[in-house]
Structures are given as structure tokens and as C-alpha cells.
Amino acid sequence: MNDLPMHGRVALVVGASKGIGATTAEAFAAAGAAVVLAARNAAALAAVAEGIDKRGGRALAVRTDVTDADSVRNLVERTMATFGRLDAAFNNATDGPPPAPLADIDPDEFDRGIHTNIRGTFLGMKFQIPAMLGNRSGGGAIVNMASTAGVSGTANLAAYVAGKVGIIGLTTVAALDYADRGIRVNVVAPGPILTHHLRAAGPQAQRLAGLSTPMRRIGSATEVAHVVLWLCSPQSSFVTGAVIPIDGGQSAGNKPPQMSRPGQAMAEPGHGRSRR
């Protein structure tokens, strides 16, 4: 008996050319799944697929535009033609305009972010779900990528936040629609994760991002991948419609670096009492 949790299963990872997507695809392969990789960058996809193949896994790379229905339909059809089934999907593509106050955002840039996040996730599930319903074993698991920004909001990121809130809503409805048909749908909501964006921002930005979490550090793509893998495995068979933060406690609330003793603040200068 094989003890790999995804042995004999087929996983589809959208946005698999780099970062969290590539790391998650590699995690699926290491857990025994055949993996289908999707993204716009064909060369980067091929490199990830080659790495999986060299480590003894099975990978298929399919260049895909998640906002185009025909492209997403082709992705799922290629998956079924190659492997004959689809058991797990991670819809991870994301986009958004540069940070700016809401009134300063270009409408076309706003639309682009919404299309990638909401339309891309919708199209992914639209074609993934029928394929999963056809599995002899019945059903499958879908994980969609949101963000803590979709849970609590972030200033100057209106398009990104709106997109992530929309993904959470789509996930909730899909989970309800298919809960009694063997398909589970959940959301992961990462906080600050060390990917190429945060690496490019430099050490100071990384330090500040870490300090924004109660755990006082940033997360890794591997930590996100582990949660996605669990949500797609039999170990989470009673979990659907959930939003799982992966944020070091950031969405739970604020934790000041140093807490004052009760009443201490009132004893400080300027609060009605003076020191002798």
C-alpha cells in the first residue's frame, strides 16, 4: 500500500510558473500526484514541469489564459485526455494594479485585476467541477487563492481587495452547490509570504512585513503549499466552504510589540499625573 497522500490522483495548479503556484505543484508531485501546470508563461511552466519530471514525478504544462473561457476549457480537456481524471485543483492566478487610492486607479487596470481574480477563478471552477463529477471515485477538492486583504481589507489596493473578496464569495457558493455531490471547495488567505514580490522589495520591506504579524515573521511558499495539499487530501474530508488564513495570526487582530501593565498608560506624563 502506498503511503503518499495523493498517490494515483491528478492535481491541476493554475498560476504554476513561479512562487506559491510552482511550490504547490512540486508539493503535489512529491505527494504522489500527477500534476497539470497552467500559466501564461510557457517557458517558465516548462522549467517547473521539467524539474518535477527529473525528480520522478509526472507533469503536464499547458499555457493558459485564465480569463479566456476557451483557454480554460482546453486546459481541463488536456488534463482529462492525458490523465483521464481530475481530483484536485488550486486556482492561484492573481493580478492587480499598483497601489493607489481608489479614485486614482485606472478603470482598465481595475478591470484587469477583477478579471484575473474573479473571472479566472469562476472559469476555473466552471470547467473543473464537471470533470470532477465524472470521477468514478466521486468528487474532488478545489482550493482558491484569496488573501488576508480579502478578509480585512488593505488601503490603496481596491482592485486587489475587491477581487479577493469576490473569490471568497464564489468559493462559499460553490461549496454549498456541490457539498452533497462530493466536491469540496475552500479558500486559503495568505498574509505576507516570501515570494518574488517581497524578495524584490528588499530586506527592510521584508522585516516590516514580518513585524505586521503577531508571529513577527513572514511565511514561506512551502507553508502555503502544505495547507493547500491538506485541503485537497482525504484528511480534510469534512472541510468545505472554509477560509483558512495562513498569516501568522495577522487576521486575528493586532498584537503591539510591548503591552503596558493595566493602568500604566494613565500614570505616564500627560495623563493627569506627574512623576516626582
Where is each model-derived feature located?
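C-terminal helical subdomain
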Residues: 187, 203-239, 246-248, 271-276
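Short, well-ordered secondary-structure patches that form non-catalytic structural/interaction elements
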Residues: 104-111, 115, 203, 267-268
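Conserved glycine-rich cofactor-binding loop
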Residues: 17-18
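Alpha-helical segment proximal to the catalytic Tyr-Lys
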Residues: 130, 176-180, 237
